[in-house]
Amino acid sequence: MSRNQQLFEQSQTLIPGGVNSPVRAFGSVGGTPVFFKRGLGARLWDEDGKEYIDYVGSWGPMILGHAQPDVIAAVQATAANSLSFGAPTALELEMAQLITQLVPSMEQVRLVSSGTEATMSAIRLARGFTSRSKILKFEGCYHGHADSLLVKAGSGALTFGQPSSAGVPPELAAHTLTLPYNDVQALEHLFEELGKEIACVILEPVAGNMNLVRPTPEFLGALRSLCTHSGTLLIFDEVMTGFRVALGGAQQLFGIKPDLTTLGKVIGGGLPVGAFGGRADVMAFLAPLGPVYQAGTLSGNPVAVAAGLATLKQLQRPGFHEELALKTRQLTDGLARAARDAGVTFSAQSVGGMFGLYFSAECPASFAEVMQSDKQAFNRFFHGMLEAGVYLAPSAFEAGFVSIAHSEADISQTIVSAQGVFSRINDQ
């Protein structure tokens, strides 16, 4: 029995499902989860000593790669002065200054400890500011595990939400409306019927939790126009896209200005952190200035903020995001070419340093189209690549991530490995 198998068996006796976040259990792809012990650059090593090229990147934060020297030095220097104060620090001011400089729509910002906290707090703020209860999200978009966001779409455009998790009261879920991603007609219909009752619309401006789905320009434009007309706040959940698809996030890339933005992942450099911010008149409703309460013992934790600052400073290097996007396109183009040569139905696309792999003829534009891809083929591909030393997201419904630490040799090795795996897929 491998060390990974031993650890997973032991973990299942003490930790529900053996993991502290469900996707890590390999439930979607089957098999034993990999237990990692070390990372450096674009590489990971598991408890059995096996080496992998990493395309998960801790689900997005590791944009510089693992154990980046400047980030490690910042963490060590800050930790030497204390791990936490529970009081204001100069570091959190520096972080707020940098975020508002890089993302101009965020006129003010509040630091929290996770992406879930950020989205949960932004929605509460939107409800407090507008004095409305309903919110709109899109099918297949994930915004953390707050109760009101664990809702899936019904069959009709105006169907009120039904809980997609036990423990979420139906009466709470009823305030959450859902629509298909990229469906402008359904969006216009909903706002015609209920626009004046909707506090906010929250969306991933590049969906990354139903694999990767790009927004259409018409969809984003309609969202901004309808929200402005109805007095509804537009929230961009940039926990995943923030500072990754462009220095100013997806809103810079697509030229759409939201009212509120949520951040996480990259701004912690690998440590737990989140943030939300936006229009100053909206942020003024937050306590201690306003009636909307939000607090946190570890909010603005100095060690996490130091790691985030060190990361963001690296991202400001001229050409950083162009280089990252090029590496990612080289990966997806190479994988698509390898699949085509092997006669495997496959498509791939990328946005900045994010990418999506689909066992379907075309890249999907909605959750329904994502669901039509061949998930069994993906599972075979995942395990073949894992055996070859390439670590991809263990689910057909998750985006992948490239770091600036990935070399041409890493990408070439990945494509060569994929050629062998693709050649075997149709035989299985």
UniProtKB/Swiss-Prot annotation:
For molecular function, the Gene Ontology terms on record are: glutamate-1-semialdehyde 2,1-aminomutase activity; pyridoxal phosphate binding; transaminase activity
| Subcellular location as annotated | Cytoplasm
| Keyword vocabulary terms for this entry | Cytoplasm, Isomerase, Porphyrin biosynthesis, Pyridoxal phosphate
Record's GO cellular component, any one?
cytoplasm
The organism's superkingdom is given as: Bacteria
- As stated in the Swiss-Prot or TrEMBL entry, residues carrying the post-translational modification N6-(pyridoxal phosphate)lysine are 265
Q: Which reaction does it catalyse?
A: (S)-4-amino-5-oxopentanoate = 5-aminolevulinate
Give a single Pfam family match: Aminotran_3
Pathway field? Porphyrin-containing compound metabolism; protoporphyrin-IX biosynthesis; 5-aminolevulinate from L-glutamyl-tRNA(Glu): step 2/2
Q: What class of enzyme is it?
A: isomerase
Record's InterPro entries? 4pyrrol_synth_GluAld_NH2Trfase, Aminotrans_3, Aminotrans_3_PPA_site, PyrdxlP-dep_Trfase, PyrdxlP-dep_Trfase_major, PyrdxlP-dep_Trfase_small
Q: Which cofactor does it need?
A: pyridoxal 5'-phosphate
EC nos: 5.4.3.8
Instruction: State the Gene Ontology BP annotations.
Output: protoporphyrinogen IX biosynthetic process
Protein family: Belongs to the class-III pyridoxal-phosphate-dependent aminotransferase family. HemL subfamily.
Assembly with partners or alone:
Homodimer.
What's the name of the protein? Glutamate-1-semialdehyde 2,1-aminomutase
Question: Which species does this protein come from?
Answer: Methylobacillus flagellatus (strain ATCC 51484 / DSM 6875 / VKM B-1610 / KT)
